[in-house]
Structure formats: structure tokens, C-alpha cells
């Protein structure tokens, strides 16, 4: 990928973001920053997004670097699923990935959340299905309020057969080995 070195920091808390970002940006010239980036991993997608926002607040132009996250590979997995679906809709049906009813099974985990946000921002109505209606509704609320989605609704797994009847797209984002 063209990188020379990587410096891992583990168990980083929100209170450490400012110091890490400023140590990164102020230890290089603005031209050297072109070869520097900050990657946020971990397992908590909401914390990763909060860390991105916190990191951005502590950059001082022209001392800025890209900040990106992929906790547990959830963001790249979701983006890949959506991209493949978008291509299939275009190639096989001459349709766009917008204005669709998207059902996301196992949707309360990080891949489901990322898929829901991407799908909603593409102009789709999204039904986020989980084992617990309360949890699914809470996650849908987070998608809509925190990430600017407008059309994510939580739903209960027990009703999934009814949701699948008029679904245009179905994503399975449950954990490996779980039959949905």
C-alpha cells in the first residue's frame, strides 16, 4: 500500500486524542503531513466516530492529516456490501440504489449500523431488524440522530418474515455462524 511504517497505540481513550493528534501534526512540516494519517480501529463503531470528530477538532490548518476508522472491519464490510448491491442493481435491473426498502437482518451490530447509515443516506427506507425491538429502535434512533440518517426504523426479529415480503434489498449482517 506504499507505507513505510505504522505506529500502533492501544487502549486509547477520548482524553488522549488531543495529545496524540497534536504530537502527530506538529512533529512534521506541512509538506510531510501528506504522508501521514491516523487510523482508528477498536470494536466500538460509535466510539470510533466520536474519536474522528474529536481528532478533527484538534487540527490546526495547515497542520492537518486524514483520519479514518474501521472498527472490527465493520465500515469496509458495510461499504463493500452496499457497493456490490449497487452494482448488481445497476447491471441486472438498470436501477439505482435509492428509493428502495432495505431490510437489514442482524442489524444492531456495527456492520448493520454502518449498512443502515450508508443505505439511508443513499435515499432508501431502512428497516433495522434485531432480536430485541427496544435495542433495534434505540440503534435506529442513533442512526437517525447521530449520523444524520432520516429513514432508519427499528424492528423485531420475530416479525422478519413480514418485512421480507416487500423488501427490495436484504442484508444479513449478523455474526458469523448465526442463522438468521
Where are these regions (language model features)?
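Short glycine-rich or small-residue beta-strand-to-loop segments that form or flank ligand, phosphate
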Residues: 37-41, 66-70, 103-105, 125-130
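N-terminal ligand-binding/catalytic initiation module
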Residues: 1-63
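Hydrophobic, Leu/Ile/Phe/Ala-enriched alpha-helical segments that form helix-helix packing faces
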Residues: 24-28, 55-59, 85, 89, ...
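Glycine-rich phosphate/diphosphate-binding loop of Rossmann-like nucleotide-binding domains
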Residues: 87-169
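A glycine-rich, Thr/Ser-enriched phosphate-binding loop motif common to dinucleotide/cofactor-binding enzymes
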Residues: 69-87
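Conserved active-site and cofactor/substrate-binding residues in soluble primary-metabolism enzymes
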Residues: 11-19, 43-50, 76, 80, ...
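Short glycine-rich, flexible loops that bind phosphorylated cofactors or substrates
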Residues: 46-47, 178-180
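Short glycine-/small-residue-rich Rossmann-like dinucleotide-binding loops
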Residues: 174-176
Amino acid at each position: 500500500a506504499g507505507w513505510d511504517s505504522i505506529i500502533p497505540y492501544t487502549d486509547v481513550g477520548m482524553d488522549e486524542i488531543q495529545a496524540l493528534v497534536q504530537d502527530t501534526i506538529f512533529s512534521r512540516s506541512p509538506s510531510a503531513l501528506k504522508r501521514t494519517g491516523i487510523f482508528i480501529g477498536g470494536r466500538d463503531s460509535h466510539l470510533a466516530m466520536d474519536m474522528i470528530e474529536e481528532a478533527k477538532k484538534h487540527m490546526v490548518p495547515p497542520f492537518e492529516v486524514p483520519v479514518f476508522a474501521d472498527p472490527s472491519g465493520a465500515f469496509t464490510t458495510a461499504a463493500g456490501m452496499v457497493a456490490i448491491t449497487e452494482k448488481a442493481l445497476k447491471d441486472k435491473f438498470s436501477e439505482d440504489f435509492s428509493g428502495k426498502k432495505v431490510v437489514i437482518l442482524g442489524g444492531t451490530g456495527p456492520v448493520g449500523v454502518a449498512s443502515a447509515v450508508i443505505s439511508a443516506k443513499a435515499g432508501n427506507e431502512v428497516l433495522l431488524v434485531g432480536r430485541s425491538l427496544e435495542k433495534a429502535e434505540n440503534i435506529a434512533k442513533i442512526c437517525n440522530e447521530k449520523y444524520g440518517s432520516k429513514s432508519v426504523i427499528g424492528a423485531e426479529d420475530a416479525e422478519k418474515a413480514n418485512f421480507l415480503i416487500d423488501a427490495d434489498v436484504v442484508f444479513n449482517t449478523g455474526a458469523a455462524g448465526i442463522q438468521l
